Structures are given as C-alpha cells and as structure tokens.
C-alpha cells in the first residue's frame, strides 16, 4: 500500500531542492538564460549534477543515486516552482531510454557525461501529424551495409537547441518503430530553434537528411520500440505534470503575497471576499492534484501496468489546473501581473506550454477513456 505522504528522506530531498533553487535559480537567472543561444544555464546544471539530480533514477552501479520516479517528480516539482530553464526533463528521458534498452557500450559512452551535466539530451518523437501514437511516426530508418540511414523531421523537441544527443523515434519497415541515438552534431542533422510562448525553456525542430548511423546507434531491438517509447512518453507526462504542480503552487504564493501588500480603499486587497474565494479555489484545485502526480510517479515504478492510466490522469488534470491558477494569479495582480517587468508572466507562459507538452488535456482524457474501455 502507498503511504499518502512522503518519507523523511523524500521530504528532505524536496526541501533541499526548494532551498537550492531559491538560492541558485532566481527569476533574474531565468531572464538571463532566455537571452542565451541555447537556453542552458551551465553553471546551474553543474551544481545540480554535483547534487546528483541528473542521476536520480540511475542505479548506484552506474554512478547515480539509485532513487525512484517519485523522487524525480519531487525535483521536477521544485524546478517548476522556480520556472527553471534548461533541458532537465529531456535529459532524464534519454537517461531512462539508456537504462531501459541501452547496451553496456551505449551506457558507458553517454551516461557519465549526462550525469555530470556536461552533455544534455532530448526525446524527438513528435511530427507534423501532431500524433502521440505509433501511427504518427513517419521519419524513416533504413538499413545499410554499415548501419542505418535516417530521413525525416521532428517538431517541438523539448530541450533543443541545447541537447547534444537525441533519442529519435523512426519507422523501420512498414509497422516497426525503432529508437536511435543521434548526435546533434552529426552530418545531415539540422537543428532550428522554434519560437513558443514559453521563454523559460527551449523547443526546436530537427531535420535529418540521409543521416548515416553506425549499427550501435540502435536502442534495443529493431521494430519493437513502441512499448519503450510509450514508457518514455508517460514519464515525460509525469515530469511535466510535476513541473505544473510546482508552478501552480508558486503562482498561488505570489498572488497571496501580493494581496497582503496591495492596498485599495485603505485595506489590503486580500481582505476582500472575492479575492479570498479566488485564493481558496486555487488551493482546492492544487491540493488534490498533488495526489495525482505523486501517485502517477509511484506506480510508474511499483505497478507499471497502471502507469499509463495514472500518467494521463495527472497530465490532463495538471495542465488545466496550472493554467487556471496562473490566470487567477494574474487577475489578483491586475494588469501588472502580465507585464515583462513582473516575474509572474514567466509562470503564466510556462503554464501554456506545459498544457500541451506530451499531450494536451483532451488527448489524455481520450486516452484515459480508451484505457478504461469507454
């Protein structure tokens, strides 16, 4: 049975993460990083790596902390609270792919640099069809004498252009889906940043034109990668849901703090009933959402068969809760809440991207209904 609370060690991890990010990742750093070419605050990620965050779920034998997805979700939650920039989640998905299907040689090549915060990764799966299932994958992989050739385009790759290695989903043959490790510096790979509303994290498009890969670029078995890709997409959905939870909590805190100092008619605006009710509605939505996120992260490790359903519940719920929470926070601030000068807009815009990343709420509700046989 799951204990509906965190262990002492988990609470300590979350508390330490919150304190670290409050100190090392203030809004000023988020703004500065938004102006850089790749959107990666490397000094911050070096410190995160020293804390072991890049290898939270990696076994100790491979240089990690040997923790679970719930601990990873707690760190994602705090990254969302800080609106932290950089390719953390994308790198975790590449690490998860290596742990699940990587050969010893692939692990030796990539894990040390990824865990040290020296290299970063991203999952490239979404295409022009905007589908999150196997039928949406058209990028072609064909065998050659020396290995493979890849042709196609991936859109909205979270973590580009800062990623060094991609896990690319490709169609090999008529029905098979295969995953490949592709370096962004390889010949024939073109990365183009994509503009989105969210300035706190980067997204890009990657075009592969007759990209030659060696045999050992294949992750796992040829044509049998859809279950693993679905596993990675569930992990991505849980990570984004956790990020949304932390962001919603921070937006609520900012709104309440502002309502205590902003005066109207000789009294703090937080004393007015309408704003009290608005804050109460925010709390009432956030608190039960926390259980969905933690449960999804818990069953991802403990009861994998339940993970798709739990991931969709968490992602569908948190996508909307985060957006509604920041909307209300902006209303409580008035017009200043959406100006560039006020930090709240960073969370407002991040919420919009989180809502659609790894499947929007309608997609996950449809998926949940299908999983439940409706």
Ranges and model annotations:
Residues 110-112, 129, 138-140, 154-158, ...:
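A generic local secondary-structure boundary/capping motif
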Residues 1-86, 101-106, 113, 117-118, ...:
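Alpha-helical interface subdomain recognition
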Residues 132, 136-138, 156-157, 183-218:
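Flexible, small-/acidic-enriched active-site or ligand-binding loops
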Residues 133-151:
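Cytochrome P450 C-terminal beta-domain/meander region
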Residues 153-190:
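A short core secondary-structure module
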Residues 117-128:
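A short, Trp-centered hydrophobic/proline-enriched beta-strand micro-motif
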Residues 99-102, 168-171, 181-183, 207-209, ...:
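Short beta-strand-to-turn element immediately C-terminal to the catalytic PLP-Schiff-base lysine
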Residues 67-68, 133-135, 159-163:
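Short glycine/proline-enriched turns and hinge-like loops at secondary-structure junctions
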